[in-house]
């Protein structure tokens, strides 16, 4: 469900460094098509990605192109189209379940969570909720799943439920899910200490997000400032918090940072277009 760009994603056996709702997205930066998306030229980007799909020599390469198309739609805030193409990528991974179950089920969950992330960021909460559940369910189907990875899927889902509740104005439910996520992290600390170290850094994103939608903008800022990932979405949320606090100069500073983000992934898909609109670009 949370950013670091991945290279050769579809060949990796494990991508566990990617956490709640802001995971990296298609391998590398995505080439010329990704640059076109960054410039707001989505139709041209998808034409480039479609050509890559048509010329791809392997099913894995075709799946990569489909995922790039999904992210292209994300840059336009199109939740439904993003989900449609992520579903196509999931279908590819279903064909890999027998050969590489330790990766295939994980990637199925990743793709569903990626669609969910785009949907929640752009306000389609019902679709986001459905895809977050789908992501948890798909990922947890992994045969002989390790305890730490099982914790990971629970943590991601609780993280998502807290954010969804916060967006819907249900402060009590949001806080309940934050505490559930904390408890799962504590369990992960024992089950898989290395995975715990990867995931604990994403907690300020959650607490800051919940604080922001509860109207506590100072706490939101303080929490976001604890996030050391240089995440484009967090940068955009800091700009939003400064706006709410009436500090337009700081808001502009952070919108400019968000507009300059690089990445072909859900955080950038929200941050870059939103920042450019705010700045009148």
Where are these regions (language model features)?
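"A position-specific structural signal for the A-helix of alpha-solenoid helical repeats
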Residues: 31, 68, 107-110, 114, ...
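Disordered, low-complexity segments in secreted/periplasmic proteins that are enriched in proline
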Residues: 18-32
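TPR/TPR-like (Sel1-like) alpha-helical repeat modules
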Residues: 87-91, 136, 179-183, 248-266
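Boundary/linker segments of alpha-helical solenoid repeat arrays
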Residues: 59-62, 93-104, 139-150, 185-196, ...
